C-alpha cells in the first residue's frame, strides 16, 4: 500500500508537469497473477536482501504493471511497452564502463501468450489504457501486428498501436519489414 502511495505521488507529479504518457520496457513480458498477501511477502523478501525466484519476480512485475496501466487508463494517459532488449551482455565492458554503454542486443523470448494475458486482464476491467507496443525482435512483428486487433474498441481510434521500428530495426529494411507485417495482419 505504501509503495502504491509513493508511486501515485510520482505519477501525480509527472502529470502536474504535463506528462500524459508512460514508457515501460521488458526483456521478456511477464504474466503471473498474485494477491496482495503474496505481493507483500515477495516485497518483504526482496527488502530483506533475499533472492527472488523467477516466479516471484514475474508476480511482482505483473501486478506492478497492472497497477500502472490501470492508473494510466483512469487518467487518460498513453502507455508504451518496449519488448525484447537484453541488456549489458558484456561483463568485462559492464565492469569497465557501467550499464547501458552499448553492449545490449535483441532478446529472443516468447511474447504472444503473456502479452495477450496482460492486456486482456486489463481489458476485462475496462482499464486498458491507450497502448503502443514496440518489439526489438523482428520475429515478433506479426505477433504484435495481429495482437493489435484483439483489443481495439470505441473508446479511442487505434487504441492499441504498433510502435515504429526502433533501435536495431530503425533502418530501411527494419521499417519495411515492420510495415509489411502490420499491413498483412491489419
Where do the protein language model's features map onto the residues?
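Histidine/acidic residue-rich metal-binding segments in metalloenzymes
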Residues: 1-130, 139-157, 174-186
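Short His-Asn-centered micro-motif
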Residues: 25, 133-137, 163-165
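His/Asp/Glu-enriched short active-site or ligand-binding loop at hydrolase and phosphoryl-transfer sites
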Residues: 159-171
Amino acid at each position: 500500500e505504501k509503495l502504491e502511495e509513493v508511486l501515485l505521488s510520482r505519477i501525480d507529479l509527472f502529470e502536474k508537469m504535463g506528462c500524459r504518457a508512460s514508457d515501460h520496457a521488458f526483456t521478456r513480458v511477464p504474466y503471473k497473477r498474485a494477491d496482495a498477501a503474496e505481493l507483500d511477502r515477495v516485497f518483504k523478501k526482496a527488502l530483506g536482501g533475499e533472492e527472488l525466484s523467477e516466479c516471484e519476480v514475474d508476480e511482482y512485475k505483473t501486478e506492478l504493471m497492472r497497477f500502472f496501466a490501470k492508473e494510466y487508463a483512469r487518467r487518460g494517459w498513453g502507455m508504451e511497452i518496449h519488448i525484447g532488449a537484453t541488456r549489458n551482455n558484456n561483463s568485462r565492458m559492464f565492469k569497465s564502463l557501467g550499464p547501458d554503454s552499448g553492449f545490449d542486443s535483441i532478446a529472443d523470448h516468447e511474447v504472444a501468450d503473456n502479452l495477450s494475458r496482460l492486456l486482456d486482464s486489463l481489458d476485462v476491467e475496462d482499464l486498458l489504457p491507450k497502448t503502443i507496443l514496440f518489439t526489438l525482435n523482428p520475429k515478433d512483428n506479426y505477433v504484435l501486428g495481429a495482437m493489435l486487433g484483439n483489443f481495439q474498441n470505441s473508446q479511442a481510434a487505434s487504441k492499441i498501436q504498433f510502435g515504429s521500428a526502433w533501435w536495431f530495426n530503425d533502418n530501411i529494411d527494419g521499417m519495411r519489414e515492420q510495415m509489411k507485417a502490420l499491413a498483412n495482419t491489419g
